[in-house]
């Protein structure tokens, strides 16, 4: 019999959790057993669509999350999950990932992985130290056409990369039509520009700056 995986959500500041949670809810081998928000670095000044309160209630209602905790550390201790989905502010990724790792909980981290390279390297060190699996929810690298392009480039079959140009149409970290004062402070650094730079670094095998 295949193992059933217990999954918890930590952080509801990122609007992508509404899509990510749907995938775990629909997967027959994963159970969304609980969720908990983190304490915001900057309190939200407005209620509305794609705020953290709205995201939490949307996920709780639509994906039948049975328990919501005030403290994510208590949730980790009580629920003993196999996997924690981390969708808090970018600046809190390291802290939350560490609390999961010391408890032996594997993590899925919403892109971008970290606010800067030093934070990312520390997260890798923690993952190795505590023997937990860590992956970044970065769908662009799962697309077969991009893997084919990278393979052809690595094999020298379609020339040499000279320059990357990226055009991004993006509504920001909250979602279409949602504008909430203060969100930029907790979303940066490591926002959409850092996220866009990851694909060229991966394709060209260059180290991120």
Model segments located where?
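Rossmann-fold dehydrogenase core element
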Residues: 122-140, 160-164
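Glycine-rich phosphate-binding loop at the start of an alpha helix
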Residues: 94-95, 117, 143
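Conserved G/P- and acidic residue-centered "switch" motifs that form tight phosphate/ATP-binding loops
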Residues: 11, 111, 156
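Predominantly a Rossmann-like dinucleotide-binding segment in NAD(P)-dependent oxidoreductases
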Residues: 15, 140-209
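ADP-ribose/adenylate-binding Rossmann-like module
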Residues: 103-116
């Amino acid at each position: 019999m295949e193992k059933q995986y217990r999954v918890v959500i930590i952080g509801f500041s990122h609007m992508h959790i509404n899509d990510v949670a749907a995938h775990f809810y629909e997967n027959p081998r994963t159970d969304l057993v609980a969720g908990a928000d983190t304490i915001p670095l900057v309190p939200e000044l407005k209620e509305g669509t794609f705020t953290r309160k709205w995201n939490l209630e949307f996920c709780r209602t639509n994906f039948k999350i049975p328990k919501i905790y005030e403290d994510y550390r208590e949730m980790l201790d009580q629920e003993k999950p196999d996997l924690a989905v981390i969708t808090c502010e970018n600046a809190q990724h390291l802290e939350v990932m560490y609390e999961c790792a010391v408890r032996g909980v594997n993590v899925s981290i919403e892109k971008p992985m970290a606010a800067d390279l030093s934070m990312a390297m520390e997260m890798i060190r923690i993952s190795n130290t505590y023997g937990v699996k860590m992956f970044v929810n970065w769908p662009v690298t799962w697309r077969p056409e991009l893997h084919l392009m990278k393979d052809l480039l690595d094999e020298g079959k379609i020339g040499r990369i000279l320059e990357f140009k990226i055009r991004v149409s993006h509504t920001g970290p909250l979602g279409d039509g949602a504008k909430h004062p203060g969100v930029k402070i907790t979303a940066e650094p490591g926002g959409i520009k850092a996220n866009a730079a990851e694909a060229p670094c991966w394709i060209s095998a260059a180290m991120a700056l």
